[in-house]
């Protein structure tokens, strides 16, 4: 499998990194808050990308506007939602070969030839902290998303209505010592969700120091359970 730097065209020009997977599902991963040093090279984002890649997904991580080589400036989540929609459109084009975007070589495999046939057609929007909120805000604009994977959703700053309205599979990760994403709020959200859902509580703070690998493991566990 190969990894390459890509440019995502949208309202801004965004830098991203595409990793071709062994299956025919795709996962877009959003980084934490740009004004607090968040970028696609964050350690938790690394762990998420590792987990999805090992599960067989083609992954796309990218920098929001104003971060790294991405053009533009921070836009309070409004422009960042547009960035995510553009990234999702780009990855969909890669996976399907639409819109003149070259399809990944592994995407040409028949379903019975992929690492996990049950990932066929699975499309994940994932995010950490601020990126988790942006992921939820984009759901109404990305009709093909089948899964939402949220790490440390910042309940202290943002509402959860879009998450509750999502009809696909929802995967939640939180730290038991997180004061930005309080555990009580996470458990309440998980309890209230009516559809298919998964929860992982890790003994960590908001930054998951020394525990990021548990996020990768949870991704593998979640999707391996759906094999066969």
Language-model region placement:
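Catalytic histidine-centered segment of alpha/beta-hydrolase-like enzymes
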Residues: 72, 204-216
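Short beta-strand/loop motif that positions the catalytic acidic residue
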Residues: 166-167, 171-174, 178
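Catalytic histidine neighborhood in serine/cysteine hydrolases
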Residues: 193-207
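Catalytic active-site module of serine/aspartate enzymes centered on a nucleophile-bearing elbow/loop
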Residues: 212-228
């Amino acid at each position: 499998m190969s990894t390459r730097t890509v440019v995502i065209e949208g309202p801004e020009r965004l830098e991203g990194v595409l990793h071709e997977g062994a299956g025919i599902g795709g996962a877009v991963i959003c980084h934490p808050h740009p004004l607090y040093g968040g970028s696609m090279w964050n350690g938790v984002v690394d762990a998420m990308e590792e987990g999805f890649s090992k599960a067989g997904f083609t992954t796309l991580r990218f920098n929001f506007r104003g971060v790294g080589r991405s053009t533009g400036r921070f836009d309070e989540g409004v422009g960042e939602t547009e960035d995510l929609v553009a990234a999702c459109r780009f990855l969909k084009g890669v996976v399907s070969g639409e819109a003149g975007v070259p399809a990944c070589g592994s995407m040409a495999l028949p379903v019975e030839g992929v690492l996990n046939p049950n990932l066929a057609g699975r499309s994940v929007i994932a995010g950490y902290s601020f990126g988790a909120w942006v992921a939820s805000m984009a759901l109404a604009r990305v009709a093909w998303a089948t899964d939402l994977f949220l790490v440390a959703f910042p309940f202290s700053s943002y509402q959860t209505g879009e998450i509750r309205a999502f009809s696909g599979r929802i995967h939640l990760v939180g730290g038991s010592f997180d004061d930005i994403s309080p555990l009580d709020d996470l458990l309440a959200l998980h309890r209230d969700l009516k559809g298919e859902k998964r929860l992982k509580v890790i003994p960590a703070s908001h930054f998951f120091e020394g525990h990021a690998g548990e996020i990768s493991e949870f991704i593998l566990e979640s999707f391996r359970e759906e094999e066969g």
